[in-house]
Curated annotation (Swiss-Prot):
Phylogenetic lineage: Eukaryota, Metazoa, Chordata, Craniata, Vertebrata
Name of encoding gene: PLA2G4A
Positions annotated to bind Ca(2+) 1: D40, T41, D43, N65
Pfam families given in the database record: C2, PLA2_B
Protein's UniProt name: Cytosolic phospholipase A2
Listed result of changing S454A: Reduces phospholipase A2 activity
InterPro entries given in the database record: Acyl_Trfase/lysoPLipase, C2_cPLA2, C2_dom, C2_domain_sf, LysoPLipase_cat_dom
Residue(s) carrying Phosphoserine: S2, S434, S435, S437, S505, S515, S727, S729
Reaction catalysis annotation: a 1,2-diacyl-sn-glycero-3-phosphocholine + H2O = a 1-acyl-sn-glycero-3-phosphocholine + a fatty acid + H(+); a 1-O-alkyl-2-acyl-sn-glycero-3-phosphocholine + H2O = a 1-O-alkyl-sn-glycero-3-phosphocholine + a fatty acid + H(+); a 1-acyl-sn-glycero-3-phosphocholine + H2O = sn-glycerol 3-phosphocholine + a fatty acid + H(+); 1-hexadecanoyl-2-(5Z,8Z,11Z,14Z-eicosatetraenoyl)-sn-glycero-3-phosphocholine + H2O = 1-hexadecanoyl-sn-glycero-3-phosphocholine + (5Z,8Z,11Z,14Z)-eicosatetraenoate + H(+)
Localization: Cytoplasm; Golgi apparatus membrane; Nucleus envelope
Effect after changing R485H: In GURDP; uncertain significance
Length: 749
């Protein structure tokens, strides 16, 4: 039976934009007036401006001493057809100091019909004639993908990966336990999750991945999802030129060397100057800049210093043949004045796509950060390097550089990152990058001549760099406001219609809801206001959005894996989150994930926090659906926590420690020791600290391989009993209004 993906038939409503094309053809008899022409021959150019579109201002090149210029230059504007769009045409004269306006005219775009193309003459000063060619068409192929379904590339990956996993599971589990794997359809979907926790999470996850690789578990996984510190390890691993041919063991040796150095070495004046020069280039191109950009550079220099030009898109070559699990990364979109725990949209990143499932909007990775309007790119920038994304994914730790540098807390209110930059730049900076302004919209028409400006731009840049360095090492709001710490990108959903809300689980009313009452949903895990505003939409009028570390809401990347389109059967999660002590209950983040899932009607096994009281601290806990027959879509969760229990006694599973040296190396606490090197804010790991944490999680994982294997066998059996695990019957559809009419009218087989 072929698999039908019902999600591809759900309509994600969006309105098509219009593309307005203007060709500036020519002008004749350009004049500065009788007196002006006596003094100088015009150097004409044309400015085009439409205030209702983000990339609003365009200009032609200028011709020296030419009263009959022929430009033949083409410009495109993406327009909202519901707006009153007016084209302002300005004829300019380029001068060395200040350009001069020679005349203006306007054209109402709504006077044209879609599909129409015509030449329109404009008269300036009763003498000059300028001719423009204009055309209007519908943008029927937006750059955003509007869909609730997985992208075709991920679907192809899943099919290829299932064949690989089927053989790997047979080898791992043996003939008896894998006899249910008759075809790829019987293969359960296994996901591995890593939490946040700074370098502690990164180092711990390195030990986990080594164990999963050696044991063969990694070959049975479809996804590896990370958050914050875990994404740093995933980025290091997947960007390594020798992975997956070379396993984590050798790559982890390189990692240990990289994190043994003092991070202050990365903040020498010479290196900071290089960082800021890169930021100058980015800012000058019209992109927002925050301290997260610098933080990403520092993380990149530490972990992937010899591949700083690597991009997320380039990681596709690691997964295109399905030889390793698909990596999934995450950050949050947040609102400037609302707690992340109250409101946050989860943004997912893969080598194939970046987007927000809540709105059914996705884009190719190389478009993230570009300027969009109504789903169409209006200004494309170079793809952000992987280290920039690493800074965004772990941006909560950008504040730690206050501590590293000894910067005291600034109490200045209302001082944004952009205002801070404005204070230390000159008026010649290309864009002021204010949080919600459009640079081009606010440029004065009489601007300095570009050629003249180039003569002293380098001096201004040098001054900007000098002041930026001073800001980095002084008491600065750059460090002390969310505006300064949070990443910021152009809003790729600018101008979209979000009147329709799309639940993350639009197709089913899961039976798990029956066992989860309103009192439980109202019960607070960490904060009385947690998730209070998660149903609110993104502001589609804001020109830029804040993107921050997902750990600021909860520290496990379950939202990526719980998308029903991915149909995950078994989740193996590793939680490196900080706890008050080694003996503290380890379920806070998991309980937050459970509550978030229930509020989004996503299947999740009941988490019983009292298992800690009954069984004490363990290396891992297993949570299963209470009633598998009724909860067919509910995954099983194996939850590993950061705990040093059996590792103190055994150097390998079943192999006791014998010498005093072996016992001493394993005798350490993680959270109880006030001198512990495993603090969330520690970004330097001596070799011994690295090996201790790495080997601890390597041991804990290997020590529970049988638990993982048993869960895999059960997942195979669940698949056998529920062959339509990934598909959804229309009889279970909760929100049929989302389906297109053609799909609903088809006869049911």
């Amino acid at each position: 039976m072929s698999f039908i993906d019902p999600y591809q038939h759900i309509i994600v409503e969006h309105q098509y934009s219009h593309k307005f094309t203007v060709v500036v053809l020519r002008a004749t008899k350009v004049t500065k007036g009788a007196f002006g022409d006596m003094l100088d021959t015009p150097d004409p150019y044309v400015e085009l401006f439409i205030s209702t579109t983000p990339d609003s201002r365009k200009r032609t090149r200028h011709f020296n001493n030419d009263i009959n210029p022929v430009w033949n230059e083409t410009f495109e504007f993406i327009l909202d057809p519901n707006q009153e769009n007016v084209l302002e045409i300005t004829l300019m004269d380029a001068n060395y100091v200040m350009d001069e306006t020679l005349g203006t005219a306007t054209f109402t775009v709504s006077s044209m019909k879609v599909g129409e193309k015509k030449e329109v003459p404009f008269i300036f000063n009763q003498v000059t004639e300028m001719v423009l060619e204009m055309s209007l068409e519908v943008c029927s192929c937006p750059d955003l993908r509007f869909s609730m379904a997985l992208c075709d590339q991920e679907k192809t990956f899943r099919q290829q990966r299932k064949e690989h996993i089927r053989e790997s599971m047979k080898k791992l589990l043996g003939p008896k336990n894998s006899e249910g794997l008759h075809s790829a359809r019987d293969v359960p979907v296994v996901a591995i999750l890593g939490s946040g926790g700074g370098f502690r999470a990164m180092v711990g996850f390195s030990g986990v991945m080594k164990a999963l690789y050696e044991s063969g578990i990694l070959d049975c996984a479809t996804y590896v999802a990370g958050l914050s510190g875990s994404t740093w390890y995933m980025s290091t691993l997947y960007s390594h030129p020798d992975f997956p041919e070379k396993g984590p063991e050798e790559i982890n040796e390189e990692l240990m060397k990289n994190v043994s150095h003092n991070p202050l070495l990365l903040l020498t004046p010479q290196k900071v100057k290089r960082y800021v020069e890169s930021l100058w280039k980015k800012k000058s191109s019209g992109q927002p800049v925050t301290f997260t950009d610098i933080f990403g550079m520092l993380i990149g220099e530490t972990l992937i210093h010899n591949r700083m030009n690597t991009t997320l898109s380039s990681l596709k070559e690691k997964v295109n043949t399905a030889q390793c699990p698909l990596p999934l990364f995450t950050c949050l979109h947040v609102k400037p004045d609302v707690s992340e725990l109250m409101f946050a949209d989860w943004v997912e990143f893969s080598p194939y796509e970046i987007g927000m499932a809540k709105y059914g909007t996705f884009m190719a990775p190389d478009l993230f950060g570009s300027k969009f309007f109504m789903g169409t790119v209006v200004k494309k920038y170079e793809e952000n390097p992987l280290h920039f994304l690493m800074g965004v994914w772990g941006s909560a730790f950008s504040i730690l550089f206050n501590r590293v540098l000894g910067v005291s807390g600034s109490q200045s209110r209302g001082s944004t990152m952009e205002e801070e930059l404005e204070n230390i730049t000159t008026k010649h900076i290309v864009s002021n990058d204010s949080s919600d302004s459009d640079d081009e919209s606010h440029e004065p028409k009489g601007t300095e001549n570009e050629d003249a400006g180039s003569d002293y731009q380098s001096d201004n840049q040098a001054s900007w760099i000098h002041r930026m360095i001073m800001a980095l090492v002084s008491d600065s709001a750059l460090f002390n406001t969310r505006e300064g710490r949070a990443g910021k990108v152009h809003n790729f959903m600018l101008g979209l219609n979000l009147n329709t809300s799309y639940p993350l689980s639009p197709l089913s009313d899961f039976a798990t809801q029956d066992s989860f009452d309103d009192d439980e949903l109202d019960a607070a895990v960490a904060d009385p206001d947690e998730f209070e505003r998660i149903y609110e939409p993104l502001d589609v009028k804001s020109k830029k959005i804040h993107v921050v570390d997902s750990g600021l809401t909860f520290n496990l990347p379950y939202p990526l894996i719980l998308r029903p389109q991915r149909g995950v059967d078994l989740i193996i999660s590793f939680d490196f989150s900080a706890r008050p002590s080694d003996s503290s209950p380890p379920f806070k983040e998991l309980l937050l994930a459970e509550k978030w899932a229930k509020m989004n009607k996503l299947p999740f096994p009941k988490i019983d926090p009292y298992v800690f009281d009954r069984e004490g601290l363990k290396e891992c806990y297993v949570f299963k659906p209470k009633n598998p027959d009724m909860e067919k879509d509910c995954p099983t969760i194996i939850h590993f926590v950061l705990a040093n229990i059996n590792f103190r006694k055994y150097r390998a599973p079943g192999v006791p420690r014998e010498t005093e040296e072996e016992k001493e190396i394993a005798d350490f606490d993680i959270f109880d020791d006030p001198e512990s090197p495993f603090s969330t804010f520690n970004f330097q790991y001596p070799n011994q600290a690295f090996k201790r944490l790495h080997d601890l999680m390597h041991f804990n994982t290997l020590n529970n391989i049988d638990v993982i294997k048993e869960a895999m066998v059960e997942s195979i059996e669940y698949r056998r009993q529920n062959p339509s695990r990934c598909s959804v019957s229309l009889s279970n559809v909760e929100a049929r209004r989302f389906f297109n009419k053609e799909f609903l009218s088809k006869p049911k087989a």
